[in-house]
Amino acid sequence: MIAGAKYGHTNLIAKDWKALARFYEEQFGCIPVPPERDFKGSDLERGTGIPGAELRGAHLRLPGHGAEGPTLEIFNYNILKEKPDVAVNRPGFGHIAFVVNDVPSAREAVLAAGGQAVGEVVTLTTAAGSKVTWVYVTDPEGNVIELQSWSK
């Protein structure tokens, strides 16, 4: 095991990092963690392997984990690759999940804020008898979000 390892952040690359950060602040209560990031130069190019790379963005504290909890890092590069179509079953990172009080209401709020529907609200029962009501939606840039609520 790697000594001292703990979860730090998840990164989203955005077309418009400020608009996407605002979406996560307004819809899920994420809190900006200053300072905004603005990097360029040879160290960034070497670290990313992208010649001419420049990036700007911010970290947002995720809700429910206190002042030292993990963040959502939203960056924009000056050089962007095309994004593939949304697919919840693509290998690699699939989605970010938020526990909410009311899944259908949260779904409607995300859609009203520019997100898109991926699937329908469903409830599944685990082998232990717990129930999870959930749905997949996207943020305004097409990143998949799971909205979920657990009950016994």
Locations of the language-model features?
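Helix-adjacent hinge/juxtasegments
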Residues: 72-76, 86
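Generic beta-structure capping elements
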Residues: 63, 75-77, 150
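Short, flexible turn/loop "capping" segments at secondary-structure junctions
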Residues: 2-4, 88-89
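Eukaryotic phosphotyrosine signaling hubs
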Residues: 7-9, 91-95
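Amide-forming acyltransferase catalytic core, primarily the GNAT-like/NAT-type
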Residues: 59, 79-80
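Core segments of cupin and vicinal oxygen chelate
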Residues: 13-68, 112, 128
